[in-house]
Amino acid sequence: MNNTYYITTPIYYVNDVPHIGHAYTSVASDVIARFMRLSGHEVMFLTGTDEHGQKVEKAAIDKNIDPQKFTDQTSQSFRHLMTAMHISNDDFIRTTEERHKKAVAIFWQKLLDNGSIYEGFYEGWYAVRDEAFYDESELTADKLAPTGAAVEWVKEPSYFFNLSKWQDKLLEFYEANPDFIRPISRRNEVISFVKSGLKDLSVSRTTFNWGIKVPNDNKHVIYVWLDALANYISALGYPDQNSNYGKFWPANLQVVGKDILRFHAVYWPAFLMAAEIPLPKTIMAHGWWTNEGQKISKSLGNTIDPIKLIEEFGVDQVRYFLMREITFGADGNFARSNLITRINSELSNKIGNLLQRTTSFVYKNNDGKVPAITQDAINKIYELPLLKTAINSAKQNILLMEKTEINKILDNIINLAEEANIYIDSEAPWNLKKTDPEKMLEVLYALLETLRYIAVMLQAFMPSSAGKMLDQLGVNTEERLFKHLSLEFALTSASDILEPVIVFPRFEE
């Protein structure tokens, strides 16, 4: 069985200021990458920045700065976002890097050699903001792109990619691979778009210079989307089969926003088919966030700065909220009151309360040690409904992640914490201390073991907080994978726990 797992975010456009959408895509991808590592996979997780194109050239000229210097500066804001959000990417690709430029030139040549690129003349509507061409039929009544971007009529020599040739092959591929585009609503949109007819795609420009030159024809710059999409293979070392390209391609999961699904689910697979490269297994399109019910836009001044949120609430709390609040793939609303409610009612009241009550009681009443009980007693504890829920949750979560049902995994974890809180109230170890000290030790062990399950499962979402929980429980750093969630790796009788500290603080409205 192939144990590798390759996941990518889209590469972020350097002209943008990092916002909640970038944070959401990155955190979701990071949760999946961490989850797969915890499952025992060898993971390659890629993110990066898209640094070519007319918009970048114009922004650099406006600032009277060289485009390379401009992108060197602006790409740093995205590196900073990754660090601040605790994103565990294995690589960060920039499209201005030599390794990328070389791979794109080879990719272009392959398409040319295979007869998929030809010279012609482009005339039509182009939106600089979207770096995209639009049909007359796609424009609004005000002659704007569907995204609201201004369009201009351009007429210039161009190389074309024979996209129309791949229409039937794409439809056959979608049919044979129902999981290629997720969620199903987006899959249906893409199929409908392709069925409506594909036109050949202009893949070079001559009206600006900031980009990768077409091999052997430096009057032309390669269309920014062909350049950008190739990052997913250039970062691996394409075309060298002895590099990570041979090891990790095709990608298992490519996470994108729904606004760029067409590029990833139509153009990208067509380019790959034409270059005789295997296609990724799944393109997952997520939704957009609104802010307090309003569409987020610069003009409304209601963009959400993820760095400021982290500074106020903590990185793990923000990560948790982003993954918990909406179904991955659907649109969602950011409401500050909901963020505070989630932190207080779920993290603090349920998980934090369970952790604090249990570890504080053990620390004071059992000399800061895991209860010294027999293996028979531990075996019996594993027959309790509480531990059965814990074991089932761990198994279910693997299946949920296969379907990228991320928020349902958090449902399971919170439900387990709720069940454990009911258990501690009903068993009342503080009373058992006087009436049945032996039973008290068994109850405390069951609670500590349940907390171990919760913490191990929470690591992908809240790596720092879950790590603190596991440290408190005295869990060996080598025994924190999903395979360790079993009786065989249960907490060692009479082992030390650390002095309790608050891991999930409350926040005032």
UniProtKB/Swiss-Prot annotation:
Q: Report the principal subcellular site.
A: cytoplasm
Query: Which GO cellular component term is one of those annotated?
Result: cytoplasm
Q: Motif 'KMSKS' region, which positions?
A: 295-299
Which compartment or compartments is the protein found in?
A: Cytoplasm
Annotated transmembrane regions: none
Signal peptide location = none
The domain of life is Bacteria
GO aspect biological process, one term:
methionyl-tRNA aminoacylation
Q: Where, by residue number, does ATP bind?
A: K298
- Please tell me which stretches of this chain the record labels as motif 'HIGH' region: 12-22
**Catalytic reaction equation(s):** tRNA(Met) + L-methionine + ATP = L-methionyl-tRNA(Met) + AMP + diphosphate
Q: What is its EC number?
A: 6.1.1.10
**UniProt keywords, alphabetically:** Aminoacyl-tRNA synthetase, ATP-binding, Cytoplasm, Ligase, Nucleotide-binding, Protein biosynthesis
Determine if Lipid metabolism is one of this entry's keywords: no
Please verify whether the record's keywords include Nucleus: no
What is the protein's known function? Is required not only for elongation of protein synthesis but also for the initiation of all mRNA translation through initiator tRNA(fMet) aminoacylation.
The protein's matches in HAMAP family, at most eight in alphabetical order, are given as: Met_tRNA_synth_type2
Its protein name is Methionine--tRNA ligase
- Species annotation: Rickettsia bellii (strain RML369-C)
Which gene is annotated as encoding this protein in its UniProt record? metG
